[in-house]
């Protein structure tokens, strides 16, 4: 997977989840916050990151920095995905299916954020198993990373893209 320079892209970020974490110590409770953020350029590049800090804005900033370092390129066919795929992470499984133009993003919270920021306008998804936002985002990314475009499939099979379409 090639490195994608975030400085070259016009990235937008979206906070998917903020969790309050409490650690009970001898003197009482210690509060921290964990943030899950997805960044993307609406043009096939998307990344996610998590950050933890004493304050919410600092946790979000750390998550955005982590997300910018974790960018992937998503293959697209027009406004949708090239083929159906199932992504897995921990107890979460996400099924992503291409949809006809104009159908929109039929996906829940965390998956919707990833798809919209990746620039995928038409997709259907189904979440199977765990619905924890972090696991759902990681499963979605697993599916997107395992997605193949027509050129790579044709190269693997040793045929032309036109022959593959027949």
Swiss-Prot record:
Name of protein: Small ribosomal subunit protein uS5
Keyword list (alphabetical) reads: Ribonucleoprotein, Ribosomal protein, RNA-binding, rRNA-binding
Q: PROSITE patterns attached here?
A: RIBOSOMAL_S5, S5_DSRBD
Q: Which residues form the S5 DRBM domain?
A: 11-74
Assembly and interactions? Part of the 30S ribosomal subunit. Contacts proteins S4 and S8.
Q: What is known of its domains?
A: The N-terminal domain interacts with the head of the 30S subunit; the C-terminal domain interacts with the body and contacts protein S4. The interaction surface between S4 and S5 is involved in control of translational fidelity.
Supply one GO CC term from the record.
Answer: small ribosomal subunit
Say which family it is in.
Answer: Belongs to the universal ribosomal protein uS5 family.
Q: Which InterPro entries match?
A: Ribosomal_Su5_D2-typ_SF (IPR020568), Ribosomal_uS5 (IPR000851), Ribosomal_uS5_bac-type (IPR005712), Ribosomal_uS5_C (IPR005324), Ribosomal_uS5_N (IPR013810), Ribosomal_uS5_N_CS (IPR018192), Ribsml_uS5_D2-typ_fold_subgr (IPR014721)
- Extract the GO molecular function terms from the UniProt entry: rRNA binding; structural constituent of ribosome
Task: Note whether Ribosomal protein occurs among the keywords.
Answer: yes
Query: What HAMAP family has UniProt attached to this entry?
Result: Ribosomal_uS5_B
A single GO BP: translation
The task this protein performs is described as:
With S4 and S12 plays an important role in translational accuracy.
């Amino acid at each position: 997977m090639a490195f994608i320079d975030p400085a070259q892209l016009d990235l937008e970020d979206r906070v998917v989840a903020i969790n309050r974490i409490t650690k009970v110590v001898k003197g009482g409770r210690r509060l921290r916050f964990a943030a899950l953020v997805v960044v993307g350029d609406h043009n096939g590049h998307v990344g996610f990151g998590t950050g933890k800090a004493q304050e919410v804005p600092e946790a979000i900033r750390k998550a955005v920095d982590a997300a910018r370092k974790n960018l992937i390129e998503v293959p697209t066919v027009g406004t949708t995905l090239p083929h159906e795929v199932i992504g897995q992470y921990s107890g979460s499984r996400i099924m992503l299916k291409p949809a006809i133009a104009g159908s929109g993003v039929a996906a829940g919270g965390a998956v919707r954020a990833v798809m919209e920021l990746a620039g995928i306008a038409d997709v259907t998804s189904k979440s199977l198993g765990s619905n924890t936002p972090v696991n759902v985002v990681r499963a979605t990314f697993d599916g997107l990373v395992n997605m193949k475009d027509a050129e790579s499939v044709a190269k693997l099979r040793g045929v032309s893209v036109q022959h593959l379409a027949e």
